[in-house]
UniProtKB/Swiss-Prot annotation:
It comes from Bunodosoma capense (Knobbly sea anemone). Binds specifically to voltage-gated sodium channels (Nav), thereby delaying their inactivation during signal transduction. Thus it strongly stimulates mammalian cardiac muscle contraction. SUPFAM superfamilies: Defensin-like (SSF57392). The keyword Disulfide bond applies. It is found in: Secreted; Nematocyst. This is Delta-actitoxin-Bca1a. Belongs to the sea anemone sodium channel inhibitory toxin family. Type I subfamily. One of its GO terms (cellular component) is extracellular region. GO terms for biological process: regulation of signal transduction. Transmembrane segments: none annotated.
Amino acid sequence: CLCNSDGPSVRGNTLSGILWLAGCPSGWHNCKKHKPTIGWCCK
């Protein structure tokens, strides 16, 4: 999950992701749709 928010740097990209089972909470976006009901959510 590559994001612009603060997080550990991996190959020059910041990572900040949380796996949600029912989409993403308000203020977050789903950066990778693994399955219809699973969201890899980033701020």
